[in-house]
Amino acid sequence: REKRSTFIQLPSIHLMPIIMSFTVEKEIVQFNGKLQKLVHESDLTKTSMKVNVFLPPALTKAKVPAVLYLSGLTCDPNNATEKSFFQYFASKYGFALIFPDTSPRGAKIAGEDDSWDFGNGAGFYVDATESPWSTNYNMYSYVHKELLSKLGEQYSLQIDFKNLSIVGHSMGGYGALTGFLKNPGQYKSVLAFAPISNPLNCAWGEKCFGNYLGSDKSKWLAYDPTHLIKEYKGEIPEILIHQGAADSFYSTDHQLQPENFAAAAKEAGYKVDLRIVDGYDHLYFFISSFVEEHAKFHAKYLGLKL
């Protein structure tokens, strides 16, 4: 008889695909590290979002901590990467940098391009509750939840997302203070350059909160750092704030009011090192002049060697 071979069919094995959320549009070598310009689709803003990530040379040895940098009104991820010089010190101390955008782009909402301090470039790091903004303008949850979660998947071998700090400038300084205070334990430290410190009490805050959150000012309290620090429970490391004395938004327009935040922090038993520096304005010349102090401050709380 003819012998027949018997084949046993094994069940097929389906390997879980590695899903990359981000597309690298450009990679630039800088200070022996890499600046990656990324784009991805956001579930919360329902638009394509851009973000820049700087990876220091230290990550060739182990995972590195990261600092989240939130930019101010009219900015996109490129402003700080091109003007702050933060990457030099991130490379020196060994931490990554994350530069999100300041609003959704391409939402095509009527009125979002009508002024420079509202809409495009001015998402104000809130989750909007008012129509038509609530569909796309969810920058608070986008930055502190969705973006960090997706980056955590993308850079799971390079960045330690349990060792984060946060900093910001102007609207971004407000966003950093708010994000730190609303997410206890998520960030090791928080610093700010010329932050909008008491938005309930200034024209920028009234305009953005009124449109994004509605007319009920009690809802605004959830995004006001001066209120949030009064309600905070737990440990807070010293908060460093630099403010230029020649900044017209501070001295003339009274949009920033860091003294209000410092006073509220003191009353609540927390320490704020508010440094009013003569001669400096609101621009990146000011930021780049003091970014080394901020980088060193973050490195300390991230457990890095100084």
Give the label of every model feature segment.
Residues 21-306:
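Non-catalytic cap/lid and distal C-terminal segments of serine-dependent acyl enzymes
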Residues 1-19:
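Short, Lys/Arg-enriched N-terminal segments with co-localized hydrophobic residues
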